[in-house]
């Protein structure tokens, strides 16, 4: 066995292996310092009604994850019993490092679970119970977890039958902000071969009626196609539909909504690495929310982050993102541009980590139907070195 230690800088990943007794330690950290012209402190931008923001130079918090995983027992049949625990720390830039309080930050345990994996009786599948990150699908440049079944519960995962992998999870709470505890059932079937290098996965979520007053049941359906070896990277296309509490799509939504409330979403994004020095990621998201009482809303998001390496360790990274929300009262728009000279000691590729970036994000003022002409605002940020890195900030 070996232990994997992941180290890095600023939303980046670096892996260093060395011998140990089946213990794995992983960490993630992002941190930085910055200012904004006219206000002094760094500002971050997100359009009201948009579910995400483009994150390069647009994250105003310290965030860390510290994870330990231990294989406790390996049986004669090859199955392995293991435990996993993760602590997370969150604190806003303009607050003292207290990691507590609604306006300051938090210290949590987003993962603490046990798993019995590689079971012959399940054709290599596994059993698990606890709180864990589970089947998370996200877009890196906007940190959008559009299909995320992370939860507190238990389940059966990746049981191979007839060339397909079947999974089922039962949970009660799937994110920090879920007010009503509702029983959620998640069914997944993966491995449909659609074309050379392409696979389809289907997922169905059913949310039972919660215990509070005026709550309802709901459901959501997701279909996702993944195309490997696409321009040197990977392409993902997902269609999602939900009703009632299922309108949360990737999460449990508002439990007071009934079947007259519906949400539709289309997600398309891909990575590319057409040469060793030129790579990036591009995304397009469209979501339509149907609500009673003329509370409908449409959200569209387009973004791209190309990276070109001038040398083996120095990149020029840019990010351009645009969000548009059509809602009661008119249409809102927000565009953001970021330029980031980047030191990348592990190589020139887009996904090479760690990275240290000196960031200059700019955005025009939010545009409304009666707004004045837009003007650009700029913030400068040169992040401080961070000792750990691991991809993603979970909401469980």
Model-derived features: positions:
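Beta-barrel outer-membrane channel/assembly domains of diderm bacteria
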Residues: 2-3, 7-123, 271, 305-308, ...
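Short loop/turn motifs that connect adjacent beta-strands in outer-membrane beta-barrel proteins
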Residues: 19-26, 69-83, 119-126, 160-167, ...
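Transmembrane beta-strands of outer-membrane beta-barrel pores
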Residues: 31-37, 72, 87-93, 131-135, ...
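Surface-exposed coil loops of outer-membrane beta-barrel proteins
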Residues: 32-56, 96-110, 121-211, 378-388, ...
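Solvent-exposed loop segments that connect transmembrane elements
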Residues: 41-49, 176-180, 212-214, 244-259, ...
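Transmembrane beta-barrel architecture of outer-membrane proteins
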Residues: 59-67, 108-111, 149-153, 182-186, ...
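Detector for outer-membrane/organellar transmembrane beta-barrel domains
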Residues: 187, 192-327, 333-337, 343
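A contiguous, mid-protein "functional segment" used to position or interact
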Residues: 332-343, 355-363
């Amino acid at each position: 066995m070996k232990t994997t230690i992941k180290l890095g800088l600023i939303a980046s990943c670096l892996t260093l292996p060395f011998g140990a007794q089946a213990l794995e330690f992983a960490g993630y950290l992002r941190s930085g310092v910055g200012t904004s012209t006219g206000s002094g402190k760094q500002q971050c931008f997100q359009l009201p009604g948009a579910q995400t923001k483009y994150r390069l130079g647009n994250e105003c918090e310290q965030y860390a994850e510290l994870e330990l995983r231990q294989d406790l027992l390996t049986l004669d049949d090859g199955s392995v019993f293991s435990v996993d625990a993760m602590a997370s720390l969150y604190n806003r830039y303009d607050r003292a490092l207290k990691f507590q309080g609604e306006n300051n930050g938090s210290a949590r345990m987003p993962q603490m679970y046990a798993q019995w994996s590689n079971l012959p009786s399940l054709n290599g599948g596994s059993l698990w119970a606890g709180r864990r990150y589970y089947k998370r699908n996200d877009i890196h440049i906007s940190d959008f977890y559009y299909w995320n079944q992370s939860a507190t519960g238990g389940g059966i995962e990746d049981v191979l039958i007839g060339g397909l992998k079947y999974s089922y999870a039962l949970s009660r709470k799937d994110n920090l902000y879920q007010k009503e505890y509702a029983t959620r059932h998640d069914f997944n079937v993966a491995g449909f071969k659609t074309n050379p290098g392409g696979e389809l996965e289907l997922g169905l979520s059913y949310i039972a009626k919660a215990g509070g007053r005026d709550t309802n049941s709901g459901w959501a359906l997701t279909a996702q196609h993944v195309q490997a070896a696409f321009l040197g990277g990977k392409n993902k296309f997902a269609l999602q539909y939900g009703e009632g509490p299922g309108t949360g799509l990737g999460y449990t939504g508002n439990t007071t909504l009934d079947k007259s409330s519906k949400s539709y979403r289309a997600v398309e994004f891909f990575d590319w690495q057409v040469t060793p020095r030129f790579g990036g990621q591009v995304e397009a998201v469209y979501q339509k929310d149907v609500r009673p009482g003329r509370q409908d809303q449409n959200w569209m998001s387009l973004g791209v982050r190309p990276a070109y390496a001038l040398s083996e360790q120095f990149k020029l990274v840019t990010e351009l993102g645009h969000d548009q929300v059509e809602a009661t009262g008119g249409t809102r728009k927000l565009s953001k541009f970021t330029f980031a000279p980047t030191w990348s000691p592990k190589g020139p590729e887009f996904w090479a980590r760690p990275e240290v970036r000196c960031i200059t994000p700019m955005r025009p003022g939010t545009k409304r139907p009666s707004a004045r002409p837009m003007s650009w605002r700029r913030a400068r940020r040169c992040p401080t070195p961070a000792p750990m890195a691991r991809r993603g900030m979970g909401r469980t």
